[in-house]
């Protein structure tokens, strides 16, 4: 469930790559990453779910500490912040921008999960 060991290994590999690139490219280039959670995209909301999509979305939203599913546009300001001087002290960091899913993961609710 959740993608299994290959998915998990790929996430850890990306985190390691961010840290290694941050080390190698400092001080001229800062490298940080963003780990989003569920995003409202065609890939995140497969058509195979058909008419079940609204109930699945409602169930996911109920399971999140910040109960909404963001769109890709919701991350723009975070990326701009990371590219700005406001983040000049940050490098090698992965920001969890996942509506709190990393706190406990998705838990089963009565809303469709």
Positions of predicted regions on the chain:
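Alpha-helical segment proximal to the catalytic Tyr-Lys
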Residues: 23-27, 88
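A glycine/serine/threonine-rich, flexible loop-to-helix segment
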Residues: 38-63, 106-113
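Short C-terminal tail/terminal secondary-structure segment
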Residues: 80, 91-113
